[in-house]
């Protein structure tokens, strides 16, 4: 595997329920490196760009309304195979179908309140990182335990 970056966002339901620390901890314990982090209430314009692939879907308006309804914690994580690993840690989109031990399986309520968003592939990750972060907001650093993280 190669070192890559992914975009994750703790949605307003996760922030309001006080799950930020729990979720951050899962990715830290997995050994991934946090290179970008900010909390914001997304603008309608940002939300519409982020969910643009769903523009023609009947749930688009509700999705945009929800993600702009409160604070979101936007993050960029880095590591070997981080995109696929993050998807596995997050679990299925529908919490009732997500495996126990995953974020959505343990913490999600329903498809509309599933706590977290994660990029689904390299192209999406690149698009979402560029949409939510300026390059100056991303930090290149090496953890002191780096030699224990990668071969």
Curated annotation (Swiss-Prot):
InterPro entries: NDK-like_dom (IPR034907), NDK-like_dom_sf (IPR036850), Nucleoside_diP_kinase (IPR001564), Nucleoside_diP_kinase_AS (IPR023005)
A molecular-function term among this protein's GO annotations: nucleoside diphosphate kinase activity
PROSITE patterns registered for this protein in UniProt: NDPK, NDPK_LIKE
SMART domains, A to Z: NDK
Residues at the catalytic site: 117 (pros-phosphohistidine intermediate)
GO BP term, pick one: CTP biosynthetic process
Annotated keywords: ATP-binding, Cytoplasm, Kinase, Magnesium, Metal-binding, Nucleotide metabolism, Nucleotide-binding, Phosphoprotein, Transferase
Binding site for ATP: 11, 59, 87, 93, 104, 114
Cofactors demanded by this protein: Mg(2+)
Positions of disulphide bridges: none
Subcellular location, record wording: Cytoplasm
NCBIfam families: PRK00668.1
Protein function: Major role in the synthesis of nucleoside triphosphates other than ATP. The ATP gamma phosphate is transferred to the NDP beta phosphate via a ping-pong mechanism, using a phosphorylated active-site intermediate.
Complex formation: Homotetramer.
Protein name (database record): Nucleoside diphosphate kinase
Recorded name of the encoding gene: ndk
């Amino acid at each position: 595997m190669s070192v890559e970056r992914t975009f994750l966002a703790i949605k307003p339901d996760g922030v309001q329920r006080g799950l930020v620390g729990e979720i951050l901890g899962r990715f830290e314990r997995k050994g991934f490196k946090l290179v970008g982090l900010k909390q914001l209430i997304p603008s309608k314009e940002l939300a519409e760009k982020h969910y643009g692939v769903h523009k023609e879907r009947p749930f688009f308006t509700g999705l945009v309304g929800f993600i702009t309804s409160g604070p979101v914690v936007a993050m960029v994580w880095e590591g070997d195979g981080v995109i696929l690993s993050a998807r596995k840690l997050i679990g299925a989109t529908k919490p009732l179908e997500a495996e126990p031990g995953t974020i959505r399986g343990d913490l999600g309520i329903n498809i509309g309140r599933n706590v977290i968003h994660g990029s689904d592939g390299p192209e999406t990750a690149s698009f979402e990182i560029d949409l939510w972060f300026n390059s100056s907001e991303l930090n290149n650093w090496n953890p002191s335990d780096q030699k224990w993280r990668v071969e």
